[in-house]
């Protein structure tokens, strides 16, 4: 896991995540750890971050969808990023978080091992992802270089395929 936690989920203010000016969010990423790898998603896609909570399983959901949560009256499907990446399932702990994002006007939560920080990454420090056969389905959209660290940048809208999205949310992507 991360040796230094720059910001914990409880330290990221709701104001920072509530529909700020999009120009202020350009080039900013919420970084998180999953299976010892550092990932990032555009902060513009993030609605909020919540601690791990009870997930209600739903029959016939895709293998990586853990189920649904009730978040202040809203029913939100949650996906385990580890499972989506084809990694082994891990036990959740006090650092496990759910990153709630908005995809096509529906909220979707992503379970991650640990939230790291909100980071600005200049476009000139982002390289295209390596070409891999099978696997990522295009959701790894770039590789950010930060000092001695590498951040795999993900597009939350591509983590879930169109058919899976419709099954999870009842909407067509």
Residue ranges and their predicted role:
Residues 1-173:
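An acidic, low-aromatic, low-complexity terminal/linker signal
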């Amino acid at each position: 896991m991360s040796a230094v936690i720059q910001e914990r989920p409880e330290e990221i203010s709701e104001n920072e995540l509530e529909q700020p000016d999009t120009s202020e969010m350009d080039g900013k990423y919420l970084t998180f750890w999953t299976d010892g790898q550092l990932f990032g998603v555009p902060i513009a896609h993030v609605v909020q971050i919540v601690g791990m909570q009870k997930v209600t399983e739903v029959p016939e959901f895709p293998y990586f969808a853990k189920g649904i949560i009730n978040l202040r009256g809203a029913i939100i499907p949650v996906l385990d990023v580890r499972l989506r990446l084809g990694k082994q399932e891990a036990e959740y702990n006090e650092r496990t978080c759910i990153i709630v994002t908005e995809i096509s006007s529906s909220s979707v939560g992503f379970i991650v091992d640990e939230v790291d920080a909100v980071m600005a990454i200049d476009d000139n420090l982002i390289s295209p992802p390596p070409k891999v056969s099978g696997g990522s389905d295009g959701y790894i959209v770039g590789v950010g270089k930060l000092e001695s660290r590498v951040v795999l940048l993900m597009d939350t809208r591509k983590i879930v395929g169109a058919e899976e999205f419709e099954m999870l949310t009842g909407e067509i992507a």
